[in-house]
């Protein structure tokens, strides 16, 4: 057989070229391709005279990748003598997990090297038996549906409602001055012709394609209907926060589920940072039985790293059993080190997360006056449940999830209806700002503690 003498490194070459473009990631992973520490051990999460984390500055990345492979190989281990086994930890991995358990206040916390997908698979197998009934939020991760198929479960779905967003005419033109409103030259005029400027800066609501929270009342009605039909669910599984950052009232949902003897699984993959932020409670604190968090999404951790938290001791044995089934038998020490470092960073640097919250608040306030694009802000331009509105569909929201919504009816300079996908293309092609996801009417930018003041300023000005 004729064999080629040389093999081209397509992946490595493509990534090198991508890095050289100098794009800025408004997407996961949460480390934003930047190291947490300098060579002297000091933190580099600050704006400095050399640009620090400036979106267009790739010098730090270029320097760090020179020794990338040497560093990776030097820290890649296996279950050898004097080392530990993630599946049966007895030494320093056990110590690390014990420390994480204290940080999160759980009965047990486990590292996931196969991502939150393996955690969701494990959680469902730990709470359900073959042929059982499960009540799932319709916007759950695809791993939930795969687990349903594997166990031949009978699913029942609870569907969140779409959220309305209020619009007004603002003064600032950043991020929207290249667009006009299809309803007329004056985009402060609603479809009914009512001027929404003037006293009180009146606003008009518009339906978005963003799903709201899981209504506790709707959940309880669904459970009662299922029980009346002889189909009591073994578990309820919901996503909170959602991809768009919408948070459900986990405390009430947990109380309802437990009242009927049903386990509650919360996919908190998008909210791994909430444990370290002020003003938020995690699903663990609010009564969920099993919670899965993706460290790599919003924390400075490598892609594919996640945590599974167990709150109900009765589930721990089955969880450990299925973790060994759904995870590789050769777990990466590099992944484990990354997870430990991310959790330690969060626990030991609370002030950094306070500063992160302050940056988000300043950025959000700047965005309040945008015209044809608005930042999704429950409590500001979207009603929250605590405002006494029976039609409200958002209990809370992660301010770190930047969702920019295009006003319905907005057109570009050529008269074409403007979409989220078009906004994503403009940000990427003209300014090198890469968003996480583009929908019909909005884009999602994932922020993290790593994003600098300069990063937010550049995003706003574009």
Spell out what each predicted region is.
Residues 2, 7, 14, 103-106, ...:
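Conserved PLP-enzyme active-site core in the AAT-like
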Residues 53-56, 173, 191:
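Low-complexity, intrinsically disordered or signal/transmembrane-proximal segments
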Residues 43, 58-61, 175, 179, ...:
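Short hydrophobic transmembrane-like helices used for membrane targeting/insertion
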Residues 110-112, 236-239, 444-448:
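Short glycine-rich or small-residue beta-strand-to-loop segments that form or flank ligand, phosphate
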Residues 180-208:
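Long, intrinsically disordered low-complexity tandem-repeat segments
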Residues 1-70:
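N-terminal glycine-rich, Lys/His-bearing helix-loop that initiates the first secondary-structure elements
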Residues 47, 73-115:
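Conserved N-terminal alpha-helix of the aminotransferase class I/II PLP-enzyme fold
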